[in-house]
Amino acid sequence: MSITVRVITPDRIVWDNVAEEVILPSSTGQLGILSGHAPLLTALNIGVMRIRPGKDWENIAVLGGFAEVENNEIKVLVNGAELGSKIDKEKARAEYERAQTRLDEVSKGDDRRKTIQAQQSWRKARARYQAAGGLVSV
């Protein structure tokens, strides 16, 4: 049996299809969803959502939000999302490396606001690079 999956951002629908399995980057860790899953509402971290519509997996970089699971349907409402297959892997790698360098630089200082901003930028860059297949998803 399949699950209907919808990934929605404020400006578009990123995914609207059925899947056999979904893995969400929830605030408490990776959360696997199969057909018949109990109703659930969970917060999502910045990370990679994995969808298996058939035998292959699709990656989606998600930028935080919520997911609701009910009656074999998953609604994912996120601040931003991008299909891994649409992300340029080399550009994502360069963005990730720049974000890592920036985080290393600001972490040495004592400006908490800049450190938090650099951490968020690094998380977003890591999610995009992972979704593109550049890093092993955790």
Swiss-Prot record:
SUPFAM superfamilies: Epsilon subunit of F1F0-ATP synthase N-terminal domain (SSF51344). Pfam families: ATP-synt_DE, ATP-synt_DE_N. Produces ATP from ADP in the presence of a proton gradient across the membrane. Belongs to the ATPase epsilon chain family. CDD domains: F1-ATPase_delta. Keywords: ATP synthesis, CF(1), Hydrogen ion transport, Ion transport, Membrane, Thylakoid, Transport. The keyword Lipid metabolism does not apply. This is ATP synthase epsilon chain. It comes from Microcystis aeruginosa (strain NIES-843 / IAM M-2473). It is found in: Cellular thylakoid membrane. PANTHER family: ATP SYNTHASE DELTA/EPSILON CHAIN, ATP SYNTHASE EPSILON CHAIN, CHLOROPLASTIC. F-type ATPases have 2 components, CF(1) - the catalytic core - and CF(0) - the membrane proton channel. CF(1) has five subunits: alpha(3), beta(3), gamma(1), delta(1), epsilon(1). CF(0) has three main subunits: a, b and c. Its main location: membrane. GO terms for cellular component: plasma membrane-derived thylakoid membrane; proton-transporting ATP synthase complex. It is a peripheral membrane protein. GO terms for molecular function: ATP binding; proton-transporting ATP synthase activity, rotational mechanism. The keyword Transport applies.
